[in-house]
Amino acid sequence: MPALLVSKSPLLSGEVTIHGAKNSVLPILAATLLCRTPCVLHNCPDILDVTHTRAILHSLGCASERRGASVYIDPRSCAGHSIPPELAASMRASSLFLGALLARQGEASLSLPGGCPIGARPVDYHLLAFRALGAEVTEMDDTIHCRARRLTGAKITLPGPSVGATENAMLAAVGAEGVTVIENAACEPEIVDLAGFLTACGAKIAGAGTGRVTVKGGQPLTGATYTILPDRIETATFLCACAACGGTLTLRRTAPRLAEPILNSLTESGCRFSCTHDTIQISRDGPLIACRPVISKPYPGFPTDAMPVLLASQLRAEGQTDFTETIFENRFGYARELKKLGAQLRQDENTVHLRGAPQLYAAQLFAEDLRGGAALVLAAMQAEGESTIFGVKHIERGYDTLEAALQSVGARLKTVEIPKKM
């Protein structure tokens, strides 16, 4: 089985180019089903979740091709409405095909989706939106089936600002006759990016990025060429790597305005920054000071997906701080792995209390989810000796060439094949 061997890193130095946002490209790939002509997506990360999403498109009769950092999708031959269970189980974002298929085919069927084991993440809010638009929704065992002869615009009030439910409501609303208003919508930049793509294809959407999104549906969409937003979580990962190990890194083709929460926390820790409209330079040459307590919140608050890497960056910081998770109840599964390295932390329900340790030591670690896996890599880069990290597939779900990028700036890590024990 593949594993990462990670040794203590020297000071990091160099440049890293940030890829397109995982959390943008997945709903946008699903949205291509709404188009009647081909689409081209630039800055498309080459990650496992994109591979799985393209496989779903292929299973529905669509064609796609990758050329470098661009993906070409031809949805004209879309014929199916059911997503194969093995593909649905591969990632959470498979649920986004419900809204797109309902709008295009009038019918959608999906086994309950998979993804990272960081919490329940029910699709109840998604189904509420479909029902409001006039769809008949049935749930049997582990399968969801949606059907609508005609979708009609409506007011949808989400119980909470769910990113996935907002995206699914937008996708379905594009195919609904009339005006749909989504109240209590999520405000994340990836919502704005999805709206940008749909607008480029001819959709009429207002308010994306606010708590009230309006969609005037029923118009046919044509394919467009679109560039995916930079990944703010990948940005956070490299910023935290430099904070943890010290040195100077320049991140290119990123979006500093979307990284403000992580920049603020790392500034508190003693890091220095210089930013342009699409670059961030981070330097850390003095002691790392524990940042103020962090609480994950919906945008524009601190992103839950960036909390694991920030926590990992603080393992040897001077002082103590707290990390409170309010989005996913099982987010801190990686904390017990960090303890193997000698991290001085204690979990109290949804809060981790952390005191900086004078030294960390190599251990055998197991990644169980995407962001927790990235945290283990950053932690192992600070530990004396050579750590072994299993569960590499989780990291590959959301990072494009993470290993090579870290190697290029001085980190000592490599993927090896370790035989399974009989």
Model segments located where?
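Short, structured segments at the rim of ligand-binding sites
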Residues: 1-422
